[in-house]
Amino acid sequence: MQMKTIRGLMALLLGSLVLNGVRADDAPVRQTPQPINVLLVGNSQCPTIVRNKMLEKLAESDQGARPIKVGGCIKGGASLRSHWDAGTGAGTARAMISGGAWDYVVLQDIYNVQEPAFQPYARQFYALIKETGLQTVLFGTASILSDYPKGFERQHRMHLAMGKELGVPIVDASQAYFRYFGETPSTERLESLFATDKAHPGLWGSYLYACMIYSSITQRNPIGLAAPEAIPADIARTLQETAWAQHQETAAALKK
C-alpha cells in the first residue's frame, strides 16, 4: 500500500512538471565559452610564447576567463614591411588575416625598425584587419640589449604614437622592461630577461611579453595566473605585477 502511495505521488509530480513545460530529463546545460582566437604576426621574438602555449595557459588558469587559441605567422627576421610585401599567397600574414578566423591580430615589427618603415605598414595592416572585422593590437617589443636604453625608448615612442593614431591597444614591452630593470639595474638584472644572445627574449622576457599581451587582449589581471615551472615563483609574481602595472599605465597614456 505504501509503495502504491509513493508511486502515485511520483506520477502526480511528473505530471505537474509536464504541465509547467518542464521535462523530467531536462538538466541545465553548461555552455563552454567561445575561445578568443589570436593571430601573432611577427618574427623570432615570438616563438617561445607560441611553443610554450603561454597565452593559452594564462587563460586556462584565469577563473571566469574565455579560453584563448593562438595561431602564428612568424618568420625569422621579418618586419611588418616584409610580411606585407610577401603578398597574399597561402600562409602569408595578409592571407591569414583575410581568412577572418581570428578575433585579434597582434602585429610585431622588427626591433630596429624606424618610423618611416613602421608607420605605413602598421597603417596598412590595421586597415586590412579592420576591413575583415577583426581587432588590432600593436606589440612593441624591447630592443636588443646592446641598444639599451635608446632602442627601447624608440620602440615605446613609435608604438604609443601609432596606438593613439589608430585607436588600438599596444603591448608596450620596452617600458615593461624598464620597469622591471629599475633605476640602476645590474648587468645580471639586465641580462635576466634575455636569451644568451642578448638579442631575443629568454623565458622570463617571453613570459613578461605573454602577460602583457594577455592583459591587452582581455583587460584582465595576470597576477597569480599560471607560469612556466622553470620560472621561480617569486620571479613569476614580479613579472606578472610588472606586466599589469605597465598595462594600466599604457592604457591611461593612450587616452591622453
Regions found by a protein language model. Give the residues of each.
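Alpha-helical cap/lid subdomain in secreted, periplasmic
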Residues: 93-203, 207, 211, 215-216, ...
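Boundary at the C-terminal end of the N-terminal hydrophobic targeting segment
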Residues: 22-26
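Bacterial N-terminal signal peptides
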Residues: 9-18
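Bacterial N-terminal signal peptides that target proteins for export
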Residues: 1-10
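Conserved catalytic region of serine esterases and O-acyltransferases that act on ester linkages
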Residues: 200, 210-256
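Conserved SGNH/GDSL esterase-like catalytic core that processes O-acyl groups on lipids
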Residues: 35-40, 45-121
